[in-house]
Amino acid sequence: ECYHRARLYALRRQRWMCLGDLDSFERAESLGVHVLCLDLSIPFTAARARNEGANYLIQNKPNLDYIQFVDGDCIIYSDWPKKANDFMNGNIDYAIVCGRRRERYPENSIYNQLCDIEWDTSVGDALACGGDALIRVSAFQQVDGYDEGLIAGEEPEMCFRLRIKKWKIRRIDADMTLHDAAIVRFGQWWNRAKRAGYAYASSCYLHGLTVEVFKLKDVLSIVFWATCIPLLIALLAVYNPIFVVLLLVYPLQVLKVAWLNRHKKLGFRVTLFHAASIVIAKWPQFLGVVKFGFNTLFGRSGRLIEYK
């Protein structure tokens, strides 16, 4: 078998919790995993779970150099830890190294396949990592870990703060983890996109006015395609219905995105689905942006946006 289950310091919430995923914590303990229980009087976020697990490790292993973070629905490839450690040992200016995450069952649905395409990021220096990554403890401590107030997008936000401190992030050409998105319905995909919009908005709120204008472009793109264009077309159509033809800008955008991604050689059908998903996602993402806006305006804490 090409992978093994990593020994993780995981977290419990009611039942077993590993960064927000419910499972049997008794089974985890039987496998030799240490289970760390969260204080449920404090609102749960994956960022808080990661921080508490990391801090427990650091306190009990003071000489620890690196921590491998893994999402609860992932399995680590057996040769990944050595490859990641070798890279970090030889590159002291890097805070994070990550590899290729793959979908375990891409054939089960087009949505799983879209996730697998999303995981296929470019090899080389990166702006951010995902939930699976080997992180240097000294760098993690320098930025005080993840922002526990974020309900999504905590990894790119922490990576932004690391880069401000002159740390680097690297994506190496190596298989890292297998992930089970388990997305088989359109509604699941919709909620996942909505969560992404919420993440963009919350990160932009924190750092959008910095030199990098962090995530501002993403938020503006969402607002432009989901609201500005439809409103403009609707207003013009009041004067002359012929302006409805401007709605063709959306299928044209799908074709443009498909053309720009032709080098991925996904096949005609998957390429079109992938391009269409990027364009259609602007609407659920906009709902995520709006939800963040209302939560911020009325001083409400954000709730996790689950998709499975």
Please report, for each region that a protein language model flagged, where it lies by residue.
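Membrane-embedded multi-pass helical conduit in multi-pass membrane proteins
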Residues: 224-296
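Catalytic donor/gating beta->alpha subdomain of glycosyltransferases that bind UDP-sugars
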Residues: 149-150, 156-212
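Acidic donor-binding segment of Leloir-type glycosyltransferases
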Residues: 5-41
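A recurrent flexible, glycine/aromatic-enriched loop bordering the glycosyltransferase active site
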Residues: 102-104, 118-135, 151, 157
